[in-house]
Amino acid sequence: MKKTATPKLRLLLSNDDGVYAKGLAILAKTLADLGEVDVVAPDRNRSGASNSLTLNAPLHIKNLENGMISVEGTPTDCVHLAITGVLPEMPDMVVAGINAGPNLGDDVWYSGTVAAAMEGRFLGLPALAVSLGGELFRYYETAAKVVYQLIQRIEKDSLPPSTILNINVPDLPYEELKGFEVTRLGTRHRAEPTIRQIDPRGHPIYWVGAAGPEQDSGPGTDFFAMNHHCVSITPLRVDLTHYEAFDQLASWVKRLEM
């Protein structure tokens, strides 16, 4: 009996560092062995764009010589356009990254990388966001290899429904990683103060302050795993409902007067 060839995956890649980012190029090259790779990414750095979607202006795209597609928009725009109109075929999975810098704890609320994965999940696809820790960004290949392994695992076992994986990888050679840890989000202290300066014309300008230092970073958190040279895998969900608050809210809502 003739064996039927296993169909190859079709992967959609995006990021928030921009279409020319090193991490994106290395990820695309590594994942090409798994199937067809489509890259649709912002035309420039869009870090911190979160889930913003452009609704009040047209979006221009450009087909680059290397086969990637550049979008004059946010990471969410990129994934939305790719899935709903730009790509000729529906992808099987969305992978966002490799981000230059970690997305830990409260970072996920602002991250364009996580938002790109989340948009894929909104549109019904399995989705991963991957970020490289540290500040020097030397070992993108390590993060790419981790993603390669995870995708192979997901192919066999699938993801739980409505789950996004937020993956953070230490900036180390692969051989120096201490393992994989399933983690929860930690938290940071409040952000550093806004920085006020004066421009050359004498007008005040402002810079958003740096992210706050680690606060909740004990065992079980994404911070802890990364600090101990482990890959952090945090399952995220789209449902933001605070179910534990229902009873308390219900008790005082009854006392409201119409």
UniProtKB/Swiss-Prot annotation:
Cystine bridges: none
Subcellular locations according to the entry: Cytoplasm
The protein's required cofactors: a divalent metal cation
Catalysed reactions listed for this entry: a ribonucleoside 5'-phosphate + H2O = a ribonucleoside + phosphate
Bound cofactor: record note: Binds 1 divalent metal cation per subunit.
A GO cellular component entry from the record: cytoplasm
Record bears the keyword Transport: no
MF term (GO), any: nucleotide binding
Protein name: 5'-nucleotidase SurE
HAMAP family cross-referenced by the UniProt entry: SurE (MF_00060)
Pfam families per record: SurE (PF01975)
Functional summary from the UniProt entry: Nucleotidase that shows phosphatase activity on nucleoside 5'-monophosphates.
Top EC group: hydrolase
Keyword terms: Cytoplasm, Hydrolase, Metal-binding, Nucleotide-binding
Binding site for a divalent metal cation: D16, D17, S47, N99
Lineage: Bacteria, Pseudomonadati, Pseudomonadota, Gammaproteobacteria, Legionellales
EC number: 3.1.3.5
Family of the protein in this entry: Belongs to the SurE nucleotidase family.
InterPro entries for this protein: SurE (IPR030048), SurE-like_Pase/nucleotidase (IPR002828), SurE-like_sf (IPR036523)
Major location category of this protein: cytoplasm
SUPFAM superfamilies the UniProt entry points to: SurE-like
